Every structure is written in structure tokens, then in C-alpha cells.
Amino acid sequence: MVSITDLAKEKLAELSGKEIEIPLIINGEEVKTGNIGTCVMPHDHGHVLAHFHQAGEPEVQQAIESSLNAWKSWSKTHLQERADVLLKAADLLAGPWRNTLNASTMLNMSKNAYQAEIDAACELIDFWRFNPYFAQEIHNQNPMYSPDGTRNSSEHR
């Protein structure tokens, strides 16, 4: 029987044996600028983990424009649908992505297994689960009464 610890060790060995290329993602598409930075292990500067494409002013402007365009539809998306995105991500992180997140945190931030589990996996899963709950609570508290001449409300974007 393979234990969770064995799977975590396998993922750590797999990721530490790779050098990956990280593009920018703008409007859902990979962008490779050719302006490359290097990501090394903080505890072993000779061990390269990744080469990443750095954004310049044109890429930053494209990302801003893309974000503003995405906001138009996202802000009109029902609260439950938006919550479902975070809840699905939390489920994936709590399950099949957990070892990948923990291993990458250990390698890129010099955390031990316990620190990675608490600081990366547990906290992020909690945030992705708590925030939809609290958003719904805020949504439910929209005032029913407003004094004459005013209208109290919350707009959830």
C-alpha cells in the first residue's frame, strides 16, 4: 500500500528533478517575452527550478485590459457560480493537487513538510472555502429598510 507520505516524497523528487519554463498568462493565453528570469531553491542557489518570462510594460498593459474586460462578465456572474469556482478549486487542492502544492512550496520557499502543509495547503484551502461562505453572509445582510430619501444596498461585483 502506498502512503500519502510516499506520494508526497515522490512528488518532491519529481519536481526537484525538473527545470520548467513559466510563461506569462494573459487573457488565458501563454505569452513568452524572451526576457527570462531564473527561480532557484533558496536553500540551494545552484539548483534551478524554473525559468520564467518577465512582463514588460506592454504585457502589463495587455493584462490590465484583459482583466478589465473579464470583469465585465465576471461581475455579472451570480454569486453562487463564483463561489462554486473557489469551492471546486479548494476540493482539487485538498485532493489531487495537494502533494504538488506542498512539494513546490518546500522547494521554492525552503519550507519543511509540516510548514508547507500548514502554510500552503491548509491555509489556502481554508481561504477558498471560507470566502464563499462569508460572501454569502454579506449578501444575505442586504438591508430591507432604508430611511426616506436613501436606499441602502450592497452591490456584489
Model-found features: residue ranges?
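Hydrophobic face of amphipathic alpha-helices that form TPR/SEL1-like repeat modules
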Residues: 1-49
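Generic alpha-helical secondary structure signal
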Residues: 11, 131-134, 149
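A glycine-rich phosphate-binding loop feature that marks nucleotide/adenosyl-phosphate handling sites
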Residues: 29-30, 86-89, 122, 144-151
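Short glycine-rich loop/turn motifs
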Residues: 34-38, 102, 150
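Glycine-rich loop-to-alpha-helix module at the N-terminal edge of alpha/beta enzyme cores
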Residues: 40, 45-139
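Conserved small-residue-rich beta-alpha loop and adjacent elements
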Residues: 137-157
